[in-house]
Amino acid sequence: MLPSKRVPFLFTIILFLAGLGQHTTESVLPDCVLYPRCLITKDPCCM
């Protein structure tokens, strides 16, 4: 099992990579690629 402190970090990386993939395929707004910022601001365009 991974240490509990590393799980959110890995989860953020996965979301970030998913955001980059979505950006290249759908050309969404640049702010939507910044997933860590999106999670903090709860930006609707990232849902």
From Swiss-Prot:
A GO cellular component term found in this entry reads: extracellular space
Q: Which residues form the signal peptide?
A: 1-21
Give expression by tissue: Main cells of accessory gland and seminal fluid.
Just give the chief location class: secreted
The record's GO molecular-function terms, alphabetically, read: hormone activity
Q: Which GO terms describe its biological process?
A: negative regulation of female receptivity, post-mating; sexual reproduction
The protein's location, in the record's own words, is: Secreted
Keywords assigned: Behavior, Secreted, Signal
Q: What does this protein do?
A: Responsible for physiological and behavioral changes in mated female flies.
This chain's protein is named Accessory gland peptide Acp33A
Species per Swiss-Prot/TrEMBL record: Drosophila melanogaster (Fruit fly)
